[in-house]
From Swiss-Prot:
Compositionally biased tracts (Polar residues): 183-195
Organism per entry: Drosophila melanogaster
Protein name: Homeotic protein caudal
InterPro entries according to UniProt: Caudal_homeobox, HD, HD_metazoa, Homeobox_CS, Homeodomain-like_sf, HTH_motif
Residues found modified as Phosphothreonine: T245
Placement of sequence motif Antp-type hexapeptide: 252-257
Annotated region of DNA binding: 273-332
Annotated transmembrane regions: none
Positions of the UniProt region annotated as Disordered: 104-273
Length: 427
């Protein structure tokens, strides 16, 4: 998988001739300058590392670089007799000697930023008589995979950075990257259609790079790496993992485990819930009306007696008297017209008393109530001509109410007889 890695520096600035640390090594393969300045890999990600750690890392990298150089040079010098002998089979010697050197080459590229690869490939190009030039890591490995076709001349042709192959500056791009950052394959790095595909294919480059990662993971105990290199690899791995983190689950807080609305204590009974309408029976209403006609404000003793008689609570009796007084005040306020104020008050009281007597004694007071309902002003010695139209209409309604109440009282004659007896005694 080739993932695109966004670098902050342009390609021309990062891979210019001034930034190449070992550009002069093409003409002089083994003449390494003592003032080589090692730049830590991925310096844009390690910018916040302190200077002391960076200096320690640079010193360790210099020491490691020279150790690997001498180790690899000794291995190359041991087989120099076979490599430089023109009489022997160059292709066979190349196939026999290259795998071990290639394995070391990939490990040195992975851990030492591909400094030893330049020396090894440059040695091969100079001994084989190839054209001088900075070698390509992927091209050298690709020519090894092909099998060194054409003998020593094939190595020289593969290591020559020709116009059809990938540019030689690509080595610096590989040298600066560790296994943790992904490999970037840009359009300028891919070879043109006319170049050999075995020497410049990016798929071979990726395959060899992945094999180097696998070899490093399997043989990391056999490599002579300093602790600073391990720390550097760990830091780069942590930085790259932070850049490619998968979306984590949302945090699960403690309040999510609890119910949204905890159980609250039930509030006390309010007046709205406690307020209910009590429907009184006709007998209870008649007894309360008789008591109200006697006294508008009931005494405590009489309230208790009436509550026991009517099977009501003292609170209900008290509230009924309060409501009855409020009703009377409302009626008096409604009849506060100066023309009919006195008549309205007297008529209200008389009609209430008349209705109560009609319910108490329907047989005795029916004709009397009807007569007074038809002409209520005659009983009060008031001329009928001064009667207000509203009062006349109200008198006719009283007559209808009295007739209807008479029909209802006939159905409850048994109860009303007892109530009438109690009423006559109280009167």
């Amino acid at each position: 998988m080739v993932s695109h890695y966004y670098n902050t520096l342009p390609y021309t600035q990062k891979h210019s001739a001034a930034n190449l640390a070992y550009a002069s090594a093409a003409g002089q393969p083994w003449n390494w300058t003592p003032n080589y300045h090692h730049t830590p890999p991925n310096h844009q990600f390690l910018g916040d590392v302190d200077s002391s750690h960076a200096a320690h890392h640079a010193a360790a990298a210099h020491q490691m670089y020279y150790n690997s150089h001498h180790m690899f040079h000794s291995a190359a010098a041991a087989s120099a007799g076979e490599w430089h002998s023109p009489a022997s089979s160059t292709a066979d010697n190349f196939v026999q000697n290259v795998p071990t050197s290639a394995h070391q080459l990939m490990q040195q590229h992975h851990h030492h930023h591909a400094h030893a690869s330049s020396s090894s490939a440059s040695s091969g190009s100079s001994s084989s008589g190839g054209a001088p030039g900075a070698p390509q890591l992927n091209e050298t490995n690709s020519s090894i995979g092909v099998g060194g076709a054409g003998g020593g001349g094939g190595v020289g042709g593969a290591t020559d950075g020709g116009p059809g192959s990938a540019p030689p500056n690509h080595q610096q791009h590989i040298a600066e990257g560790l296994p943790s950052p992904p490999i970037t394959v840009s359009g300028s790095e891919i070879s043109s259609p006319g170049a050999p595909t075995s020497a410049s294919s990016p798929h071979h480059h990726l395959a060899h790079h992945l094999s180097a990662v696998a070899n490093n993971n399997n043989n990391n105990n056999n490599n002579n790496n300093s602790p600073s290199t391990h720390n550097n690899n760990n830091n780069n791995n942590s930085v790259s993992n932070n850049n490619r983190t998968s979306p984590s689950k949302p945090p699960y807080f403690d309040w999510m485990k609890k119910p949204a609305y905890p159980a609250q204590p039930q509030p006390g009974k309010t007046r709205t819930k406690d307020k209910y309408r009590v429907v009184y029976t006709d007998f209870q209403r008649l007894e309360l009306e008789k008591e109200y006609c006697t006294s508008r404000y009931i005494t405590i003793r009489r309230k208790s007696e009436l509550a026991q008689t009517l099977s009501l609570s003292e609170r209900q009796v008290k509230i009924w008297f309060q409501n009855r007084r409020a009703k009377e005040r409302k009626q008096n306020k409604k009849g506060s017209d100066p023309n009919v104020m006195g008549v309205g008050v007297q008529h209200a009281d008389y009609s209430q008393l008349l209705d109560a007597k009609a319910k108490l004694e329907p047989g005795l007071h029916l004709s009397h109530s009807l007569a007074h309902s038809m002409n209520p002003m005659a009983a009060m010695n008031i001329p009928a001509m001064r009667l207000h139209p509203h009062l006349a209409a109200h008198s006719h309604s009283l007559a209808a109410v009295a007739a209807h109440s008479h029909q209802l009282q006939q159905q409850h004659s048994a109860q009303m007889s007892a109530a009438a007896a109690v009423g006559t005694l109280s009167m």
